[in-house]
Amino acid sequence: MTTSRRKAREIVLQALYEQDLAGHNAEDVLKRLLTENPQTEENVEFIFRLTNAVVKHKDLLDENIRQFASAWPVEQLSYIDRNVLRLAIFEIIHENDVPVKVAINEAVELAKSFGGNSSARFINGVLSSVSKALADTANQREE
């Protein structure tokens, strides 16, 4: 069963994908997607906030992808993988109410649903590296 937040993340991913692939305005895409897939008011706020944040911080998120998936140029990643990573990295770094393991799991599920055969494994590996680096940084601050 698809959770409410998972469906919201699917809509965010679809908007990011369409913007990345076709250059369409993400907010316009969201409006269309939300007409086709009505959501609760809470989810609509979550969807717009998350989409706008990922779009706004795309360059910084891509730098994170370059750092943690250095063997894979961001521009050569599939549109789905690239946007799943952007979304998840944003959630891991900036969404304090989303546990890291949940953000990773949600990203892996998105990759399974929308990505290629090896997408889920790739996404999991990159995000595990991001998570470990954040944990290492937090531990260094505590010392």
UniProtKB/Swiss-Prot annotation:
InterPro entries: NusB-like_sf, NusB_fam, NusB_RsmB_TIM44. One of its GO terms (cellular component) is cytosol. The keyword RNA-binding applies. The keyword ATP-binding does not apply. SUPFAM superfamilies: NusB-like. One of its GO terms (molecular function) is RNA binding. Keywords: RNA-binding, Transcription, Transcription antitermination, Transcription regulation. It comes from the Bacteria. GO terms for biological process: DNA-templated transcription termination; transcription antitermination. It holds the Pfam family NusB. Belongs to the NusB family. NCBIfam families: nusB. Involved in transcription antitermination. Required for transcription of ribosomal RNA (rRNA) genes. Binds specifically to the boxA antiterminator sequence of the ribosomal RNA (rrn) operons. HAMAP family: NusB. This is Transcription antitermination protein NusB. The gene is nusB.
